[in-house]
């Protein structure tokens, strides 16, 4: 279980980091262009101001004709740490509960407590329900499931042969009706 959880978490961190282009460091220390432009330190000099592509290649921010350095984003960092903490905590809880149940099953400890053993007798409940269901089903078949108009024929086929097999319309047997060996 741990063997599958750690690579999954690593893959998540790797994918998150590759979105920013900063790698995993971008997950733990995210940078942002948010905030006031005028409080920031300029980036790339005059050439970056004149060429926005150069500014972005230097991994700086460009807004309103100003190229400036990014700042660490503390709110995003807190969100990332919160998500990482809950993911690791949930994974740890899942692994420990699986191990606990596995251990308890091996020790044959997964039984109902003594105070619940006598109170939950399902066999009696099921038998009572099945008796009630029998009378209910009899009522349903007599009322709803049998068609109201059945074709009545004078001679009913008692031998068990299907229609056209061994009998004629009048109920007489044909030559192929019985096998005589």
UniProtKB/Swiss-Prot annotation:
Residues 1-21 form the signal peptide. It comes from Canis lupus familiaris. Its main location: membrane. Residues 22-81 are extracellular. The keyword Hydrolase does not apply. InterPro entries: P_trefoil_dom_sf (IPR044913), TMEM190 (IPR028248). The lineage of its organism: Eukaryota, Metazoa, Chordata, Craniata, Vertebrata. The keyword Disulfide bond applies. One of its GO terms (cellular component) is inner acrosomal membrane. Keywords: Disulfide bond, Membrane, Signal, Transmembrane, Transmembrane helix. This is Transmembrane protein 190.
């Amino acid at each position: 279980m741990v063997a599958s959880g750690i690579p999954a978490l690593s893959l998540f961190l790797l994918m998150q980091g590759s979105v920013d282009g900063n790698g995993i460091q971008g997950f733990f220390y995210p940078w942002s262009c948010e905030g006031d432009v005028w409080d920031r330190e300029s980036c790339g000099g005059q050439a970056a101001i004149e060429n926005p592509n150069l500014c972005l290649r230097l991994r700086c921010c460009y807004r309103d004709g100003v190229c400036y350095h990014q700042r660490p984003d503390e709110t995003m960092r807190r969100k990332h740490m919160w998500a990482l903490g809950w993911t690791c905590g949930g994974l740890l809880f899942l692994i420990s509960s699986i191990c606990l149940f596995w251990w308890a099953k091996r020790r044959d400890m997964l039984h109902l407590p003594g105070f619940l053993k006598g109170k939950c007798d399902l066999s009696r409940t099921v038998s009572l329900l099945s008796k009630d269901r029998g009378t209910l089903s009899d009522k349903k078949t007599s009322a709803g499931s049998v068609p109201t108009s059945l074709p009545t024929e004078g001679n009913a086929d008692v031998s068990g042969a299907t229609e056209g097999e061994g009998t004629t319309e009048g109920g007489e047997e044909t030559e192929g009706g019985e096998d005589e060996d």
